[in-house]
Amino acid sequence: MNYIQWNYEDDLLAGTTLRDPSLPENNNMALHACLRKEDVLNNRDTLSKALHIASSQWTFAMQTHSDHIHEVTAADAGRGYRVYEEGIADCDALYTKERNIAIGVFHADCVPVLLYDPFTGIIAAIHSGWQGTVQEITRKTVTLLMQKEHVDPAHLMAYIGPAIAYRSFEIQQDVIDRIRAMSFDTRDYLTMLPNGRAIADNKGLNMQMLLNLGVER
């Protein structure tokens, strides 16, 4: 199984699974975007065994390109692993203070952002397509952690995973307008094209939100 591993400390296990032609549906992990649910569940089970994480320890959401954030508690453990509709409803960012719970988001072109605070042990997983980005879900997640959980953004570690390449993400005027209306200067992340469209750096926009809040690692 192909994956990128991001480990900052021995007690943190984080990363991104990748396409793998040797596995069913190229290692697809998403129940909401698959041909056969059985293949996705087999892929999830293969990953769980490789990581020594039980299926009852995972928690997933029903992603809707929202700016909704959910704190995962022990009562949420196992939700969304085998049945998509049992996942956290209408949510695109998860975080938890619980140990031995795995959280994750599903992405292809969209930007995945993982956060870890080594001082509090809090972890977060954010799914940010362009809709989530213009709603500033990454900024809102960090702000919630600061205000509710008293996280110091200077302590946060951030990982921005694979997503659509900057030069491949062409957008029309409606999306251009929404990016320009964000709460910070986004000009460096838009390149106008002769056809009136633009290419947008979705990863860069999420990175800038982190930097604006004092997350620098």
Where does each model-flagged region fall?
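Active-site microenvironment for binding and transforming phosphate-containing groups
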Residues: 1-217
